[in-house]
């Protein structure tokens, strides 16, 4: 049996190349209106992305509202009221990574709930940052 509009309960959106155009590096106005229409119909809308919430604040317009956000590839999920789920990397794994970085340094980003840190940046990191339009 084919799915009807009434069968749709939720819609999940990626950020890069879905909400944000790779060409214009912005969310089209038509997308903002379409998501608002979905929400008016009672359809839940979610962002599912590898990005950090800090980046979403910079990239998504304030007028674009979602019911919840699944960030960092599902490692940090929240809505407007609460954090729903977190999956931090175990401390032993972090210690192992720091040892590897001491022995063989390479650019690495460390992410907390509220901040992002990088041990150092090189030309490749700068190029990737430009490509994904994030600071």
Q: Residue locations for each model-derived region?
A:
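Asp-based phosphoryl-transfer active-site loop
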Residues: 4-24, 97
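A general structural motif
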Residues: 5-8, 42, 66, 105
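Short, solvent-exposed loop/turn segments at secondary-structure boundaries
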Residues: 23-27, 82-84
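Charged helix-capping and loop-helix junction motifs
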Residues: 27-30, 90-92
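Catalytic-core regions built around general acid/base machinery
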Residues: 29-42, 96, 100
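Substrate-recognition element of Asp-dependent hydrolases with the DxDx(T/V) motif
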Residues: 35-57, 108-113
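Substrate-recognition/cap helix-loop segment adjacent to the acidic, metal-dependent catalytic center
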Residues: 51-69
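HAD-like small-molecule phosphatases
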Residues: 75-135
């Amino acid at each position: 049996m084919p799915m009807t509009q009434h069968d749709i309960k939720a819609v999940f959106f990626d950020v890069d190349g879905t909400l944000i155009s790779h060409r214009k590096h912005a969310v089209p106005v038509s997308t903002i209106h379409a998501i608002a229409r979905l929400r008016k119909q009672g359809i839940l809308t979610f962002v599912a992305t590898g990005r950090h919430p800090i980046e979403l604040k910079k990239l998504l317009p304030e007028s674009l509202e979602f019911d919840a956000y699944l960030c960092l590839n599902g490692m940090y999920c929240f809505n407007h009221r609460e954090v729903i789920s977190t999956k931090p990397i175990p401390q032993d794994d972090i210690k192992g990574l720091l040892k590897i970085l001491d022995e063989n340094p390479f650019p690495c980003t460390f992410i907390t709930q509220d901040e992002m840190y990088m041990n150092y940046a090189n030309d490749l990191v700068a190029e990737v940052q430009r490509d994904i339009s994030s600071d």
